[in-house]
C-alpha cells in the first residue's frame, strides 16, 4: 500500500513553514498543493485586526515562502507540479466586506501568474498554477462567517477538475462556467461597477447572518 506521513505545522509562523520544508529532506516532490487559507466577512473597520494579520500570514506569507522553497527544490530535481489555491476572489479588482481576503487571494493569483511566465521563458519543466474556485462545500464557510449567494461545488469535483487542468498545465484554473463568465465580465465593465457588484454580494451575506 501507500506509505503516508503526516506533518502538522502552523503556517501562520515562518519558522513552521521552514520546518515543514526541512522535514521533506531530500525527498522528491512530484506534486505540491498550497491549500491552507481562510477568510472573514465584515466591514474592514470592524473586523478583528489579529484575525486579519493571521489571514495575511497564512494566505500570503506562507504561500510565498512555500512556493519559493518548493520551486527551488523542483527546479533542482528537474520538474514537478506546484498548485497554489487562490480563489475567484483573486481575479476580481476588490471585494468590499471581505477586503483582506480578496486582497490576499489577488496576491496569490498575481504572484503565481508571474512565476509561471518566468518558468515558461526559461523552458522549465516545473509547472506552477493557481486554482481559483468560488464556493466549495467545506468548513471555510463557518470560519469566514459567510453564506454564499451561489451554490457551492463539492470538494471532490473541485479536486478532480484541478488535477485535470493542472496536468494540462493551465496557469489559472476556474472550475465552473458561471465563475468563468463572472471573472471574464470584469474586462468589459468599469472597475468601480464591478467592485460595487462584488460588495453587494458580500453585503447580502452579512444581512443573512
Please state what every model-predicted region is.
Residues 67, 104:
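Active-site helix of classical SDR
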Residues 8-19, 49:
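The beta1-alpha1 cofactor-binding region of Rossmann-like NAD(H)/NADP(H)-dependent oxidoreductases
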Residues 87:
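Residue(s) in the substrate-gating loop at a strand-loop-helix junction
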Residues 35-40:
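Conserved NAD(P)H cofactor-binding loop of Rossmann-fold oxidoreductase domains
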Residues 94-100:
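Active-site loop-to-helix junction immediately N-terminal to the catalytic Tyr of the SDR YXXXK motif
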Residues 43-45, 51-56:
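Substrate-binding pocket helix/loop in short-chain dehydrogenase/reductase
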Residues 130, 147-183:
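C-terminal helical subdomain
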Amino acid at each position: 500500500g501507500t506509505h503516508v506521513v503526516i506533518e502538522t505545522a502552523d503556517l501562520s509562523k515562518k519558522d513552521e513553514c521552514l520546518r515543514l520544508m526541512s522535514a521533506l529532506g531530500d525527498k522528491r516532490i512530484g506534486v505540491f498543493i498550497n491549500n491552507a487559507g481562510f477568510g472573514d466577512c465584515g466591514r474592514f473597520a470592524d473586523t478583528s485586526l489579529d484575525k486579519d494579520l493571521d489571514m495575511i500570514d497564512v494566505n500570503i506569507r506562507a504561500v510565498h515562502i512555500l512556493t519559493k522553497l518548493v520551486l527551488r527544490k523542483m527546479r533542482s530535481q528537474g520538474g514537478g507540479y506546484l498548485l497554489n489555491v487562490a480563489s475567484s476572489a483573486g481575479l476580481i479588482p476588490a471585494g468590499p466586506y471581505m477586503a483582506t481576503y480578496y486582497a490576499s487571494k489577488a496576491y496569490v493569483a498575481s504572484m503565481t501568474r508571474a512565476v509561471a511566465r518566468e518558468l515558461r521563458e526559461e523552458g522549465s519543466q516545473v509547472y506552477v498554477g493557481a486554482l481559483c474556485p468560488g464556493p466549495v462545500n467545506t468548513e471555510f464557510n463557518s470560519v469566514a462567517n459567510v453564506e454564499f449567494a451561489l451554490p457551492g461545488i463539492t470538494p471532490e469535483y473541485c479536486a478532480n477538475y484541478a488535477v485535470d487542468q493542472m496536468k494540462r498545465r493551465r496557469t489559472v484554473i476556474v472550475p465552473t462556467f458561471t465563475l468563468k463568465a463572472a471573472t471574464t465580465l470584469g474586462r468589459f465593465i468599469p472597475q468601480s461597477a464591478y467592485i460595487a457588484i462584488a460588495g453587494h454580494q458580500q453585503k447580502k451575506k452579512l444581512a443573512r447572518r
